[in-house]
């Protein structure tokens, strides 16, 4: 008598139509948010490193130009 209701409950829990538990939804939301944050941080780090490299390259080019000719150097007073 008790086996049939238990069997039905187990079938409902194991069926693919059963909704995800709340904890699983929260975990998937947190994982998705963490991945989005990681992507944004990587983009910011890449852009800042590129801009930093461009500044360094510009200084090197300016120093080389100043050593060759004084026309590209800033006037020193």
UniProtKB/Swiss-Prot annotation:
Q: Where in the cell is it found?
A: Secreted
Tissue expression remark = Expressed by the venom duct.
Q: How is it modified after translation?
A: Contains 2 disulfide bonds that can be either 'C1-C3, C2-C4' or 'C1-C4, C2-C3', since these disulfide connectivities have been observed for conotoxins with cysteine framework V (for examples, see AC P0DQQ7 and AC P81755).
Entry-linked InterPro entries? Conotoxin
So which residues are the signal peptide here?
1-19
Pfam families membership: Conotoxin (PF02950)
**Name of the protein in question:** Conotoxin Ar5.1 a
Per the record, the domain of life is Eukaryota
Membrane-traversing stretches: none
Q: Which organism is it from?
A: Conus arenatus
GO CC aspect terms: extracellular region
Task: Please verify whether the record's keywords include Disulfide bond.
Answer: yes
Which lineage is the organism of this entry classified under, starting from the top rank? Answer: Eukaryota, Metazoa, Spiralia, Lophotrochozoa, Mollusca
């Amino acid at each position: 008598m008790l086996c049939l209701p238990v069997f039905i409950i187990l079938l409902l829990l194991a069926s693919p139509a059963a909704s995800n538990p709340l904890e699983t939804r929260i975990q998937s939301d947190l994982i998705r948010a963490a991945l989005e944050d990681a992507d944004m941080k990587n983009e910011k780090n890449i852009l800042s490193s590129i801009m930093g490299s461009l500044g360094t390259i510009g200084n090197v080019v300016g120093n080389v130009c100043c050593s060759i000719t004084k026309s590209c150097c800033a006037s020193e007073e």
